[in-house]
Amino acid sequence: MDNSLDDIFGSSPPHETAHPIAPPSNPSPSNPAEPSELPSLRRQHVTAGYRDGISASKGEHVQAGFDAGFPVGAQLGMRAGTVLGILEGVLRGYESRTSSVVKKPARTAAGGATKSENPNEADAEARNAKRAEILTLYQQALKDLDVQAVFAGLQGAEGEKPETQLGRKGDVAVSGWEKRVLVAHWEENMEALEAKDDGEGEGAAEEGEASKAAPAPALS
């Protein structure tokens, strides 16, 4: 049977489109995939985050270092100050004793004045010589106990805490001067004098008088 309507209803296989739809092309530089301000904002956020991270980390580690190192430095500083204080006190003592010596001209049997002679002149010269010796010692202590000198060239074992290194090196420098100045002896005398000032009994007062009358220890 002849079907004359095939052309109308399209019973034949469908024909492919003559002009297929082209796939979307890559965006041109004039039409970017993201707004132009996003790269700038990204850089700003990265920079701000970097700075905030540095500030937070620095504050945390600086505080931890301070907490660990301050007690060590304070203890060493007090010990060094004791050494320097003892030397300064001895120097002032020699200065006051030297200035109190008054030279008077000796007189002959006829009453005439002769050249200046004083039985204490030799003692005064000895004190001046001793004062010069202690002054040299004091100046050397100032150099050796300076912060830069005490901790110069600090090197410790790998993995050792910095405060441990500081304490060990500082103790070597300070303890040497403590022995030279006889800090332990001076501290015993000071404790006896403080006990006397506080009026802690007659025995303490007598001990303080004895220690006060005792000669100053020889500084090496």
Curated annotation (Swiss-Prot):
GO terms for biological process: protein maturation. Its main location: cytoplasm. Keywords: Cytoplasm, Nucleus. Residues 211-220 have a biased composition (Low complexity). GO terms for cellular component: cytoplasm; nucleus. It is found in: Cytoplasm; Nucleus. It comes from the Eukaryota. It holds the Pfam family Yae1_N. Residues 21-32 have a biased composition (Pro residues). InterPro entries: Essential_protein_Yae1_N (IPR019191), Yae1-like (IPR038881). The complex LTO1:YAE1 may function as a target specific adapter that probably recruits apo-RPLI1 to the cytosolic iron-sulfur protein assembly (CIA) complex machinery. May be required for biogenesis of the large ribosomal subunit and initiation of translation. May form a complex with LTO1. This is Protein yae1.
